[in-house]
Every structure is written in C-alpha cells, then in structure tokens.
Design a protein with these regions (language model features):
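Dinucleotide-binding Rossmann-like beta1-alpha1 core, especially the glycine-rich loop
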Residues: 1-69, 173-174, 212-213
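A general structural signal for well-ordered alpha-helical segments in protein cores
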Residues: 1-8, 41-48, 63, 97-98, ...
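Short beta-strand to alpha-helix junction loop
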Residues: 2, 34-43, 84-103, 199-204
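Active-site catalytic microenvironments for nucleophilic, acid-base chemistry
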Residues: 10-14, 104, 108, 272, ...
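Active-site substrate-recognition segment that forms the wall
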Residues: 16-29, 127, 132-251
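Short loop/edge segments at beta-strand edges and connector loops
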Residues: 62-63, 114-116, 226
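Helical element adjacent to the flavin cofactor pocket in flavoenzyme catalytic cores
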Residues: 84-127, 131
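C-terminal catalytic lobe of FAD-dependent flavoproteins
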Residues: 216-307
Length: 307
C-alpha cells in the first residue's frame, strides 16, 4: 500500500507516454476513517502496532474524541477509530489509472489481445502470470478465487460535506465517501458466484440507509439517485491475496484474490512479481505470506475487514 501511494503520486512522470503525455489518476486525498465497536477494539489496537512498525501513518482516535474532529459523526457505539489523513490516503479514478498503465505497457512493447474465442490451441510461453481475477478458479481449479457480488449506491444529501474521508463503520459493515456533489455508499451484503449484476436494491432501505442515518444524522435526508453491482475477486479461504509461483508448474505465477483491494495493491504486486520472476526471489517486500502453497494446504491467513 505504501509503495502504491508513492507510485500513484508519481504517475505524471512514471506513466507518461507519447500518446498520453499527461497521465493522471485524479487523486482525491481525503483520507480514510475506519470505526470499530468494543468487540473489535483490542484486535484493532494490535493491528495498529503493525501499522507503526511499517510507518503507515495510521492514527488512533478514541471513540469519545471523534465528534471533536468530525463534528458530523454520531459516535454512539464506537470504541475506537483509525485515521490516515489527507496527506497519506484517499481515492482515485480506477479507469484513468488503468488507462495510464495500459498506455505505458503498450509503449514498452506489451500486446493486448481482445476478442471472442473461436478455437483452442497451444500457446508456448516462457512465463505465464494468471491475473484472471474473478475467473481464476475457471482456469486453475485448485485456487478458490471466485466472483463475489457487491452493491454500491449513489445518494444525494442536502448537506454536502466534501472534505469527508472515505469512512467505514465496522459495526454495520457499511462504508461511504463523497463522489462529486453526491456520495457513494456500499452494502455489507455480498453474494458468491452470482450470475447477474443486478443491484441488491432492497439492501438500501433495509441496511444501508438506516446505518448511514444513524452514524451521520445529516444523512436522514438523503435520496437514492442510482447504484450498480460489481464483482470482487474473492479468495474464499481467507479473503487474502494469492501471489507467487504456482508449485505445480514450472512457469506459472499467480496474482489474484484481492477482494476489492486490487487497485491499491497493484503497483506493489507488479513490482514483487517482476522481482520474483527475474531474480528468483522477492527483493523489496517479502510476499511469501500470500504464497500459493498456503491456499493449496488450506493454511488460512484471514483478512477480517472487507468493505
């Protein structure tokens, strides 16, 4: 994540091409705020120690202190919160980021092939990287990465708070952030292997709106203006990534199962796999904790918080 932040802030220089001389990811540096109830407080305090060791810049805020910093928040039921401010975190436009990466890769010689499969034949390759996301299990049946459908709602509120960070309420699983003059809000519900991408509209009235209005009183007046559903590539074993060499093959590597965090982890994963493939080992960050072997042996490393 730290490397991704550095990479994204350097996009204008790193991803500049002849065809795209001014690449951008439209960074909105509003920060991240995650709130926890008493049942998860101790677990989060332990996680913060790891954040400190990694110099992640994460700050702890007592639940009682939240209204002093974010006066629009109702802190009822919140024991503690973690916050990374606008100098460190925020969100970007994923389409623009993807386009900039693709443009640079093309300039460096990568070839992208898109089309309908008419027939099947062998293709010989020195190195293969499976980055098939939600469809990983269709290619490699021993890797339990499958589509997990999530719904996001777009809402409008008379009171707009443009400086609001991306906020996750772990007491309900609902998250939200500003999007232009509106807000995006995510449902805590998900469906594995869903064949359709019809939004779960009932979730808004039953789950999302009550949670938003309880936590941000101004949201009692919000109106639903739209929504959509999309897939996370979810590793059903532990909600964590599967990265590294596949032990059953001489030349197959994995980069999958990011459970909605692929964009923020992509730069670091790309660098790590480049090192592993070209030198035989990780050089910058050791990602053995995400090794394929752990999945094949069902050695879970659970990621407890997925928004």
């Amino acid at each position: 994540g730290k490397f991704a932040r550095e990479f994204i802030f350097q996009i204008p220089e790193l991803l500049k091409t002849e065809k795209n001389p001014n690449p951008t990811a439209s960074i909105v540096p509003n920060g991240y705020l995650l709130m926890f109830g008493p049942e998860h407080a101790e677990e989060q305090y332990r996680a913060l120690e790891n954040h400190k060791e990694c110099d992640a810049g994460t700050k702890n805020i007592k639940g009682s202190e939240l209204p002093k910093i974010f006066p629009y928040i109702n802190n009822e039921g919140i024991e503690t919160a973690t916050y990374t401010d606008s100098k460190i975190e925020g969100w970007i436009d994923p389409f623009m980021f993807h386009s900039a990466l693709k443009s640079k890769a093309t300039e460096l010689g990568a070839e992208f092939i898109k089309g309908d499969v008419k027939s099947i034949s062998e293709i010989k390759a020195k190195t293969i990287i499976s980055a098939a996301g939600c469809w990983t299990k269709e290619l490699l049946d021993d890797i339990p990465v499958v589509p997990q459908k999530h719904t996001v709602f777009r809402v409008k509120c008379p009171k707009h708070i443009p400086e609001m960070p991306l906020t996750g309420d772990l007491t309900t699983g609902v998250y939200w952030r500003p999007e232009g003059k509106e807000y995006l809000a995510g449902s805590p519900n998900s469906v594995f292997d869903a064949e359709d991408l019809e939004p779960a509209w009932n979730d808004f009235e039953e789950l999302v709106w009550p949670a938003l209005a309880q936590r941000i009183p101004a949201f009692e007046e919000l109106k639903l203006t739209g929504g959509w559903a999309g897939y996370y590539d979810c590793n059903k074993l532990d909600n964590n990534a599967v990265v590294g060499k596949h032990p059953k093959y001489d030349n197959v590597y994995m980069a999958s199962g990011f459970t909605g965090r692929g964009l923020m982890q992509a730069p670091g994963i790309g660098r790590a796999l480049t090192e592993l493939i070209t030198t035989g080992s990780y050089q910058s960050i050791n990602l053995d904790c995400f090794a394929v072997e752990r999945v094949l042996k069902s050695n879970a490393r659970p990621e407890p918080y997925v928004l």
